[in-house]
Amino acid sequence: MLKSVCMKPFASMKLPTLTVRILSTLCALTMVGLAAQAQLLYKISGKDLTRPSYIVGTVHVVSSSFFPQIVGIDEAVNTTDCVVGEIDFKEALSQDFLTRVSEAMMLPEGKTIRDLLTAEEMKSVNKALMSVTGADFDNPMVMAQMGRLTPAGLSNTLTLMLCMKHYADSFNPNDLIDLYFQKVARENNKATDGLETGEEQMRLLFGQPMEKQVRDLVCLCEHFDRAQQDLEDMIAAYKNQDLKRLGEVMDQQFLEGCSDGPQDRQQLVVDRNRRWVEKMPTIMSAQPSLFVVGAGHLAGDDSVLTMLRQQGYVVEAVER
């Protein structure tokens, strides 16, 4: 079913549930470098905590079937009372939020993607779109369905289609690992929460100047084969729980990929880490919690783990 969707134009402009959330986070994640570490799960204790909390790194396009392979995850889930994601999916799946996201992804009435790109840039976009759908913007149906997407919205949609085409047997945007953690929490009558609000994420991911959105879209399309290879390498490294290799892939993407360099990293990673670490002590003091965030936020001198240690917490890798 997923394969058939990605091999033909969308039947409507209603994007699949979670599309924006999943891919926006993936785009941010691919800009982040990681240190040479080999664990996905960390225990947080010490300071004023009477019971430990945990934090686990994910790659957001990996399915929930990988969940039991994370070393130590059962204990982390069973001994915590709340699962805290980057966003609370109760909000992300609400009709109000999905409507606002759809609006944020659309150009003003009367404008289309052709109005923003040169003829040569449109050729690059059409080539990428053709490779994952079998059609492009020269097809009136595709233009009617997707032509009003903002450049950022189109970048995210193309990345989703790439996942759907190359991981058709395992990729399901409604059965991804981040969502699964919160689903398990709800099934066990545990609380869920988010480190960011939907509004914060929309501003971050769809509030960029139009010139930057265009630049990022064109770069993605001009290097679409590279994007596919990076995605494959990233997922393979994560499933091997090889954060060293994952870091190498992401570092290379950060240095050579479609990024504005340190400015993007500061905004998408470092500033967010600081805001999260400001919120985490209150959450952990209230109840032991399991934090679920992109793996790129868990390593380096300005990572969430480093910042927690600087606040006096004991942060230990959960090993076999």
Predicted features along the sequence, with ranges:
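A cross-kingdom marker for long, charged
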Residues: S259-R320
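Bacterial N-terminal signal peptides
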Residues: R21-G33
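Boundary at the C-terminal end of the N-terminal hydrophobic targeting segment
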Residues: A35-A38
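Short hydrophobic "helix-edge" motifs at membrane interfaces and signal-peptide entry regions
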Residues: T25, K47-L49, I283-S285
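Structured, acidic catalytic/metal-binding patches in enzyme active sites
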Residues: L40, G46-Y54, V59-Q267
